[in-house]
């Protein structure tokens, strides 16, 4: 049986974390969860640790000091997963923006293609709920911009609901991933694409968080915008080559 891991980065997610963990563990299939908490002052980590006795060997946490960024959280999780023999690793938000019910389809698609599966908001029109029109348009056209510059055949290039195969993660030099905010999502997909891995999109409905606070900022957006141009002219090699 494949070993499937869900990585959930957190910062001040006490309103959501227990519910999202219980929802994932209620699904058919054996999913494990790794929470990576960046020193949440609201007690998020304590909630996770209180649940670990209830879900032994399925729930783990890495606690970091301070807000170190989304990208570094996932990179830490990827390395942790590879060391422990996981076959497929899926990124997921803690706030239910990504529906846990889509996890089986995400893992199945990744296993079938052997590369990367993307929970896509834009492969079947625009499937976003509770976002202001301005943010929807910014996100949609940002993905079109990335797709045009990088010539990558992915409709939702900035998606954060992404599943990677072990083969893809082992081929990517994780120590050479340079973008740390949401640009990290673009860089990881593009690196896998340039290394020859298939990327498939799974249609999802993205629902804006109902509880907690968004972590998006203009600085994060700017890093992604300019980082795409730099990516276009980088050369990529499989790790060790």
Give residue spans per PLM region.
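Acceptor/aglycone-binding surface of glycosyltransferases and processive sugar-polymer synthases
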Residues: 64-83, 88, 100-182, 209-226
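Cell-envelope/extracellular polymer assembly enzymes that use nucleotide-activated donors
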Residues: 3-5, 32, 187
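N-proximal low-complexity "stem/linker" segments adjacent to membrane-targeting elements
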Residues: 1-23
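Short beta-strand/loop segment that forms part of the nucleotide-sugar
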Residues: 8, 30-40, 62-63, 92
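Short, acidic, metal-binding catalytic loop of nucleotide-sugar glycosyltransferases
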Residues: 22-31
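Acidic helix N-cap motif at the loop->helix transition within catalytic regions
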Residues: 15-19, 42-51
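Catalytic donor-sugar/metal-binding loop of nucleotide-sugar-dependent glycosyltransferases
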Residues: 152-153, 176-180, 189-206
């Amino acid at each position: 049986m494949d070993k499937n891991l869900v990585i959930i980065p957190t910062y001040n997610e006490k309103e959501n974390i227990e519910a999202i963990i219980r929802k994932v563990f209620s699904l058919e299939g054996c999913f494990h969860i790794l929470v990576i908490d960046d020193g949440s002052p609201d007690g998020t980590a304590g909630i996770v640790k209180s649940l670990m006795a209830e879900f032994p060997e399925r729930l783990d946490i890495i606690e970091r000091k301070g807000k170190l960024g989304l990208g570094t959280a996932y990179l830490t999780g990827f390395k942790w997963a590879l060391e422990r023999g996981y076959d497929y690793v899926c990124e997921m938000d803690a706030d239910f923006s990504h529906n846990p019910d889509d996890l089986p389809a995400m893992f199945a698609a990744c296993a079938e293609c052997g590369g990367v599966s993307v929970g896509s908001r834009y492969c079947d029109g625009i499937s976003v709920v509770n976002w202001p029109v301005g943010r929807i348009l910014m996100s949609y056209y940002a993905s079109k911009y990335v797709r045009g510059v990088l010539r990558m055949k992915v409709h939702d290039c900035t998606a954060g609901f992404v599943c990677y195969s072990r083969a893809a993660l082992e081929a990517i030099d994780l120590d050479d991933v340079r973008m740390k905010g949401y640009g990290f999502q673009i860089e990881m997909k593009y690196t896998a694409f340039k290394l020859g891995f298939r990327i498939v999109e799974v249609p999802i409905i993205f629902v804006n968080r109902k509880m907690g606070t968004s972590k998006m900022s203009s600085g994060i957006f700017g890093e992604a915008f300019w980082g795409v141009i730099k990516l276009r002219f980088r050369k990529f090699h499989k790790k060790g080559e």
